[in-house]
């Protein structure tokens, strides 16, 4: 007998699938950073995979959607800031801030304005990061690596936006 899709089940599926997408993206970044031999981003993305597994358990077992979503927004900001500082603006990690700003449609909070606050936080981070990182990076990347990061970030960001638009 198929399960009836009520609002609680719908929220559960949305957040579970978003978290699974984040696990897949960070696993991909873990592999990529390992192949490119970038130690700090490799370690960060391993920790991110573990973080998102924890968020998946938080959603599946405890149904703590608001806490999980809040922590995911903050993790995304940390991810983008760290990787942009390390690899520069042209690696396009900032695209994830734009993708996450589109998540205002999912509101596990009591107040409908909280997702908009997170979107504003993402946009502020975007502009501040742009202003602070122009011409500064901690590592110079070969052009092929920079292009690969740009393609991966574009793909991951568009995948996130398309998922949000689809559900």
PLM features: what roles do these ranges have?
Residues 26, 52, 57-59, 69-95, ...:
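Hydrophobic transmembrane alpha-helices
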């Amino acid at each position: 007998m198929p399960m009836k899709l009520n609002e609680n089940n719908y929220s559960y599926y949305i957040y579970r699938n978003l978290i699974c997408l984040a696990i897949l993206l960070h696993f991909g970044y873990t592999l990529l950073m390992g192949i490119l031999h970038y130690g700090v981003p490799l370690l960060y993305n391993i920790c991110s995979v573990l973080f998102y597994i924890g968020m998946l358990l938080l959603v599946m077992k405890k149904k703590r959607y608001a806490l999980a979503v809040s922590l995911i927004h903050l993790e995304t900001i940390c991810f983008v800031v760290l990787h942009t500082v390390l690899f520069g603006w042209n690696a396009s990690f900032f695209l994830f801030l734009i993708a996450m700003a589109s998540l205002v449609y999912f509101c596990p909070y009591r107040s409908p304005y909280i997702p908009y606050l997170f979107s504003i936080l993402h946009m502020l981070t975007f502009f501040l990061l742009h202003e602070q990182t122009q011409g500064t990076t901690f590592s110079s990347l070969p052009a092929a690596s920079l292009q690969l990061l740009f393609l991966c970030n574009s793909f991951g960001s568009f995948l996130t936006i398309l998922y949000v638009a689809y559900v």
